[in-house]
Amino acid sequence: MENWATEKEFLDLWAVNYKTGEPIPADLIAKIVAAENYQAAYFNVRQVAYALNDMAWHSIDTPFEGDVELFERTAMAPSQILPVVDGAAMSPAFSHIFAGGYAAGYYGYKWAEVLAADAFSLFKEKGIFNPEVAEAFRREILSKGGHEHPMTLYVNFRGHKPETKALIEKMGLEKSSEK
């Protein structure tokens, strides 16, 4: 899980100045996080638009014989925040949803982020190097593979179904409850 990459406690173990041995300054970590979260809201709305478009295409029961641009515009309307550009249609070039193994599953990108952030929030609660949490993650998630339903595994680890709150905080879209 990439979430450790911007944790000061983790970075202090190895991210040091090669000459002085001084650990990476907290203000530099904050700048890295801010850069990572730049336009996070827009990026997320775009990902939702792509997922809506994907699901719309894969919900058609008969061969499509209509206007691709209009179909796409209608599918993505709930997440439209910028003016539509006439003549622009991304679907013909969106190989992820037709040839990339993500047919009707593009939403998986965002869902994976939700799972990772929510799971990591338990490490943040208990300490990012907490051996009990790490063991529970290994035991309940990693060691089970496909032997049980993924949601069952997740709930066994986390104690509840995935929540979006941790991802929203991670992206800087809501203030963290941490002090």
Residue spans for each PLM region:
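Cation-handling catalytic/transport regions enriched in His/Asp/Glu
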Residues: 1-179
